[in-house]
Amino acid sequence: LIVSSSGGIKNVVVSIVGIKKGKKWGIPKKFSYDQNGCRFVPHVLLVRPKSKGVVLNSDNVGHNFHTVSKGVYNINKKIKANAKMKVKKKKIKKAGIIRVKCDLHSWMGGWWVAAKTPYTELSDESGKFSISDIPPGKYKLKIWQEKLGEVVQDLVIKAGEAQNITIKMK
């Protein structure tokens, strides 16, 4: 859990649920994820369903790339030192949370979050995030953090108004 001096939490996934159409995806169709210094970088990665990418191993030792999810993307494959593995778009089937681990190095852990909507962002080092181009309406704000779990709260967006939202997680 990475908490800033102001109490903000890094790597919180924030999504607005219930918007039927609107802005284009900000999350790229292609991604890159690295194993570097026996850590997954970045620790939390936002991906799009049916996206594709590459998993790198920048370390001088081999790793085991193992994902666990509820039908989103599951793989268990060794990656040699200084090698890469392609992720095909058909593999990330749907939106959901994907736990990433290395069975050879138990301290290595990370997360992929396959976003359901383009209205999804990841909080920065200070715990801040920004979601733009939200049409006026009533929605659900869905917040997820790996240790603190999930929180859902109501959100009302009025035309032409920016909102500052404080989310409390326990």
Predicted features and spans:
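Extracytoplasmic copper-binding redox domains, predominantly the cupredoxin/blue-copper superfamily
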Residues: 1-170
